[in-house]
């Protein structure tokens, strides 16, 4: 049980996909201008990363390894992610049309989010079992969502703050992301993996 707790805390805080592994930077910078959009994108990404992680493990374990098709792993995972994203897009369109309009082009772009493919490939490379794969996918997504929501809240405050002209816009956003990364480095002594 403590192994699963350490995996969760370690993935969310210590080995955060955005701030430590630099995966998922495109939606991190692109969708984080408004808190509402960041929360919606975080929920959609959490659903996709968790489901894609589970599906990728199942396909790798039951199809690719037994048939000795490991060289098709990346292609198979990309196809799995595309199917999961299309399913998510249909669910969001039916359940929340307002969120669907807010997310716009970023919802189909989850397919190309390198964090989603990264979590599927890292699960296999780290040798996780089914439960660990599901938890790793979920905790990576929670870490991604946490950082994106925090960053969106900070960016909303910075939009009305008195920021010097050369630092307005993306410059202050990158400085803020760097400071967040430094803050998350403080968690590195918390968990020894």
UniProtKB/Swiss-Prot annotation:
The keyword Transmembrane helix applies. The chain crosses the membrane at residues 5-25, 47-67, 72-92, 102-122, 134-154, 171-191. Pfam families: Rnf-Nqr. It is found in: Cell inner membrane. Its EC number is 7.-.-.-. It is an enzyme of class 7 (translocase). One of its GO terms (cellular component) is plasma membrane. InterPro entries: Ion_transpt_RnfA/RsxA, NqrDE/RnfAE, NqrDE/RnfAE_oxidrdctase. The complex is composed of six subunits: RnfA, RnfB, RnfC, RnfD, RnfE and RnfG. Part of a membrane-bound complex that couples electron transfer with translocation of ions across the membrane. PANTHER family: INTEGRAL MEMBRANE PROTEIN OF SOXR-REDUCING COMPLEX (PTHR30335), ION-TRANSLOCATING OXIDOREDUCTASE COMPLEX SUBUNIT A (PTHR30335:SF0). This is Ion-translocating oxidoreductase complex subunit A. The lineage of its organism: Bacteria, Pseudomonadati, Pseudomonadota, Gammaproteobacteria, Enterobacterales.
């Amino acid at each position: 049980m403590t192994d699963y707790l350490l995996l969760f805390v370690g993935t969310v805080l210590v080995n955060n996909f955005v701030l430590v592994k630099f995966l998922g930077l495109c939606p991190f910078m692109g969708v984080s201008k408004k808190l509402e959009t960041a929360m919606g994108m975080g929920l959609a990404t959490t659903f996709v990363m968790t489901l894609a992680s589970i599906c990728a493990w199942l396909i790798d374990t039951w199809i690719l390894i037994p048939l000795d098709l490991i060289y098709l792993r990346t292609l198979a995972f990309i196809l799995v992610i595309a199917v999961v994203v299309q399913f998510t897009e249909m669910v969001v369109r039916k359940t929340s049309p307002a969120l669907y309009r807010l997310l716009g082009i970023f919802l189909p772009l989850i397919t190309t989010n390198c964090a989603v493919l990264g979590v599927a490939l890292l699960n296999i490379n780290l040798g996780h079992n089914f439960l660990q794969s599901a938890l790793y996918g979920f905790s990576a997504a929670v870490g991604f969502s946490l950082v994106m929501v925090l960053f969106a809240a900070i960016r909303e405050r910075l939009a009305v703050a008195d920021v010097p002209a050369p630092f307005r816009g993306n410059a202050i956003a990158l400085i803020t992301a760097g400071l967040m990364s430094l803050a998350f480095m403080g968690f590195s002594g918390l968990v020894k993996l």
